[in-house]
Amino acid sequence: MTPLDKGLDKARVLIEALPYIQKFAGKTVVIKYGGHAMLEQDLKEKVMLDILLLHSVGIRPVVVHGGGPEINSMLTRVGKESHFVRGLRVTDKETMEIASMVLVGKLNTEIISLLNRFGGRAVGLSGKDAQLLQAVKKPMQFQNSQGELEDVDLGFVGEIEQIRPEIVTSLVEQGYIPVISPVAGGEDGESYNINADTAAGEIAKALKADKFLLLTDVPGVLRDVEDKDSLLSVIKEDEISGLIDLGVISGGMIPKVECARAALQGGVGSVHILDGRIPHAILLELFTDGGIGTMFNA
């Protein structure tokens, strides 16, 4: 390929992206950043560059990050065993302190530092700042072997009771990129660990985001999990229940899809589940005709 051919290819990419850039300019895009894309340095940098490009063309990105593997690693280092019930971490006082340290003190700082190093204007927040996320203790029951319901104490695991997005809106309007860790405050003065997908979805709803992106370690929703070419590129909200009944949406994908459905019902324009292991996944999903993940819309 000659230098001219390479240049023409780059020009075609830009021309393909142009209508999407024009369409999304001024719109809010909430990005749930998690999975493998948080662990590999090269992928981290590509995600940050994608976010900065969105910001540079007039799109308003808001980042909400997870950190489960890093929390597990820190708990292992201090000799504390992790326990989960239905995918939710049982969080005692010490575990909550460690989770907060990792999410707010380490990961949030690393993300904003990387964004700013590449020329961005990122500001780190936790859900406790300006009472962004107010939570209550999450009640939970499960069925025991006798078929009876038993209460389970998850400790300092919360569910969002109220959200005050004004601080995020203010930062976005001033040209900043908010980066939010999913630690919420309660009226009891305690800190609560919030599922990052849930926190991101609630923030997307409160901001009436045009798009909500979930970076995961899977390509999206596959009609056949054994066939990577069976990706469902678009799913309508009213098709979700049927796909769950058929088993097309199953296992760990169900809570992510339910999060997508709740976001749509809360006024979010569209929700995208995409593979964060693919370099520049965000740009490929938003700025190409075919996209690379599964888009949910009404």
From Swiss-Prot:
GO terms for cellular component: cytoplasm. Its EC number is 2.7.2.8. The record marks K32, K256 as: Transition state stabilizer. Keywords: Amino-acid biosynthesis, Arginine biosynthesis, ATP-binding, Cytoplasm, Kinase, Nucleotide-binding, Transferase. It is an enzyme of class 2 (transferase). GO terms for molecular function: acetylglutamate kinase activity; ATP binding. One of its GO terms (biological process) is arginine biosynthetic process via ornithine. Pathway: Amino-acid biosynthesis; L-arginine biosynthesis; N(2)-acetyl-L-ornithine from L-glutamate: step 2/4. Gene3D superfamilies: Acetylglutamate kinase-like. It is found in: Cytoplasm. The keyword Nucleotide-binding applies. Substrate binds at G67, G68, R89, N193. Pfam families: AA_kinase (PF00696). It catalyses: N-acetyl-L-glutamate + ATP = N-acetyl-L-glutamyl 5-phosphate + ADP. Belongs to the acetylglutamate kinase family. ArgB subfamily. This is Acetylglutamate kinase. It comes from Desulfitobacterium hafniense (strain DSM 10664 / DCB-2).
